[in-house]
From Swiss-Prot:
GO biological process: negative regulation of extrinsic apoptotic signaling pathway in absence of ligand
Residues annotated as domain Protein kinase: 162-419
PTM text: Activated by phosphorylation on Ser-486 by an unknown kinase (may be mTORC2 but not confirmed), transforming it into a substrate for PDPK1 which then phosphorylates it on Thr-320.
Residues recorded as bearing Phosphoserine in the entry: S126, S129, S486
General function of this protein: Serine/threonine-protein kinase which is involved in the regulation of a wide variety of ion channels, membrane transporters, cell growth, proliferation, survival and migration.
Residues in AGC-kinase C-terminal domain copies: 420-496
Organism placement in taxonomy: Eukaryota, Metazoa, Chordata, Craniata, Vertebrata
Subunit structure of this chain's protein: Interacts with GSK3B and FLII. Interacts with PDPK1 in a phosphorylation-dependent manner.
Residues binding ATP, per UniProt: I168, G169, K170, G171, S172, F173, G174, K175, V176, K191
Compartments it resides in: Cytoplasmic vesicle; Early endosome; Recycling endosome
Protein name (database record): Serine/threonine-protein kinase Sgk3
Organism of derivation: Mus musculus (Mouse)
Amino acid sequence: MQRDCIMDYKESCPSVSIPSSDEHREKKKRFTVYKVLVSVGRSEWFVFRRYAEFDKLYNSLKKQFPAMALKIPAKRIFGDNFDPDFIKQRRAGLNEFIQNLVRYPELYNHPDVRAFLQMDSPRHQSDPSEDEDERSTSKPHSTSRNINLGPTGNPHAKPTDFDFLKVIGKGSFGKVLLAKRKLDGKFYAVKVLQKKIVLNRKEQKHIMAERNVLLKNVKHPFLVGLHYSFQTTEKLYFVLDFVNGGELFFHLQRERSFPEPRARFYAAEIASALGYLHSIKIVYRDLKPENILLDSMGHVVLTDFGLCKEGIAISDTTTTFCGTPEYLAPEVIRKQPYDNTVDWWCLGAVLYEMLYGLPPFYCRDVAEMYDNILHKPLNLRPGVSLTAWSILEELLEKNRQNRLGAKEDFLEIQNHPFFESLSWTDLVQKKIPPPFNPNVAGPDDIRNFDAVFTEETVPYSVCVSSDYSIVNASVLEADDAFVGFSYAPPSEDLFL
């Protein structure tokens, strides 16, 4: 009966091992989690299992395959279950158990075993639609399990480091939560994304682009900062600045429009942030009031960098159709090559909305709105200054080559008469008092967030993965799609 995988099963025969175990705490209970490394063909991944899950699988299989004499280490009734020698011995016994499972095709092809090892998970199977360019440029001998963590020796991060207090936002792939770090009581916005949804929609490039852009935001006052990121086998976590003055969209809805000096102030801070992104060859591509936050003092903070395009210099173009319909530039709708000037179009659209209460070419019918953007002249109603009219006309120029910012990018925006009364140096140093104070009561005040979000129940699953599959920032990660996601801060920003 003792036989290894024969040639007929060579393609699907898994290789398994338990390289390590870790102690975890949940609701004041301690338990040991065993990390199972699974390899099938060129794919590798980790599965994190408790002893009880091994025991459940064992009891299921021994009834169906009594002749195979499977065994696992017995439960310990007396003594310390967390004694290092005991855990080492138990891990060896569990390792022997799973080694026996993969020696027999009838066992490793059994649904219970495949589920235990997550062999049918979509994220462990190659994607036949992967671009040929991506395949050809990938390194054939590179390991899939290395994470770029920055300086070595940085501490681990995991969901249980936080108390998740409130839902404060929601997107296509997950939620944004207000979280309090247990170590020091500091508040953060933690963006939690479901890997499964990201992978199913083939959006991992956008997620990694968002991470990369966030890492470059550290030194700009009007861009949200990433403190660190980490992952479990099911979720991705961005630990971000908690900015609690509310979305510009929230305040616009409440006030309908802003006085021109207030709109000018916000437009200047937004332009400064966009100019910085352009200087490091990043096009933002998704400027809209929902992505513009106010901090506790009333300064602008841009967030949500999922649609950013990296590596675009002032003379470069790209062609991807993306963004939000109300704010799309004509060249994007036409699917023509576009460049940095799409961001200046969006700035014009947001400035128009701040002054007049609606985007410039808004229509409930999206097709008609696209037609308006492409062909309808800009309607500038009374109530704003001549310089405001001028900058709106120049930013919302349908020909990108004639648009304000086409030649010298942010410098042209800075030099426009609309901003003549501003000192850009004082602006970046936050020496200009904001025209509106959100009047937040403290670092955890959520009054400026929509009750649609804050009244939601915080999902328990964000605190611990359902299969106890905690992946610290220092462990090897076997998911190709998110290699490099985990990020630990440089030494001056250590969080432990």
